[in-house]
């Protein structure tokens, strides 16, 4: 193999894209990963890091451009870590995400008879985030800065706009930056673990336009809070709720456990099709409401509900998917390990007048065995776990339960593929549909249908 050393300048043709969107050039089968390089491009690049099994390169010049390359519309794209694919046409982004799923399920796991559908995309793949989490800091000139982190760092890129956030959120961000400066509010400095203001979080109801503004502070004492609230309401009279969240943990976790309502309601309301949901500052709620409706509609299609089925909604959160399915089912049982989420789910069931739902707090693998002992046998099980996927104990419990169908929603196809191999003992993976919940990024969500053999 050719010698490869740091700072070498080389040329080559990009032959593949990684799941992180990096171009792959190979030298005698040795891969070099190059951010922002695209398949079939002939490029010049510099080796910046060499490892045992791969190297990292920096793109210097593009000698032959891909037909899928586009000019990134965001002026911060080269520095900000929020997006990874703005230089790739949206049609090619959707195809890349489908290829990622094909690679996981067919090429690696050999689910050769399982159908992989086209990625479900957006008509307008911008301004889709209904929640913004914006770090606050100071620059070298001691000026207040707000924006998003540089890739793989905690260096804040001071930004005036973000093309994937709700446009109202950037208006709030810019106003808050001015308010913090004018009122001389103490700013948290991560390295020193001193200062007050840590993050600004903004949540918006996609269909209702209700807005919640949350200030995350390093401690409860905040002398200027009344003045800040007054200025926010002067600038944005449509704000429904203003809250202070207290996080003095000095960790990477954005929000703490205690929140104080400074103005308005404790929650905001949003709708998904015909269902209404209360959302608190801490609630898990899908970031992209438009795509969530498409995702849930596909899940209902897979569930094949006629009104006579018992549905078990595991990892149910605030009850979004369970309540979405309730009008089409005989009864929905939801289980979630987070107590506050179950409280939200029960309130959401009341709001939606769903009398055919039961929500219980506990570990799914334990609660479903209790339900089994009570004679409750689900026809369909909904699974929507966090990125780490399902606990193996839960999978084994599910296999003993033997529902007719399992509908598995995942925000991490890699762990979904791992779990699919365990489910294959008794279930046939019929098909997988990728859904583009986060355009311009490498993330892809999937919904899969498993039928009992």
From Swiss-Prot:
CDD domains: AdoMet_MTases (cd02440). Its EC number is 2.1.1.-. Gene3D superfamilies: 2.40.50.1070, Nucleic acid-binding proteins, Vaccinia Virus protein VP39. InterPro entries: MeTrfase_TrmA_AS (IPR030390), MeTrfase_TrmA_CS (IPR030391), NA-bd_OB-fold (IPR012340), SAM-dependent_MTases_sf (IPR029063), U5_MeTrfase_fam (IPR010280). Keywords: 4Fe-4S, Iron, Iron-sulfur, Metal-binding, Methyltransferase, S-adenosyl-L-methionine, Transferase. Disulfide bonds: none annotated. It is an enzyme of class 2 (transferase). One of its GO terms (molecular function) is metal ion binding. The keyword Flavoprotein does not apply. The active site is at residue 411. Pfam families: tRNA_U5-meth_tr (PF05958). [4Fe-4S] cluster binds at residues 74, 80, 83, 162. GO terms for biological process: rRNA base methylation. S-adenosyl-L-methionine binds at residues 286, 315, 336, 384. Belongs to the class I-like SAM-binding methyltransferase superfamily. RNA M5U methyltransferase family. This is Uncharacterized RNA methyltransferase SAR1988. It comes from Staphylococcus aureus (strain MRSA252). The lineage of its organism: Bacteria, Bacillati, Bacillota, Bacilli, Bacillales.
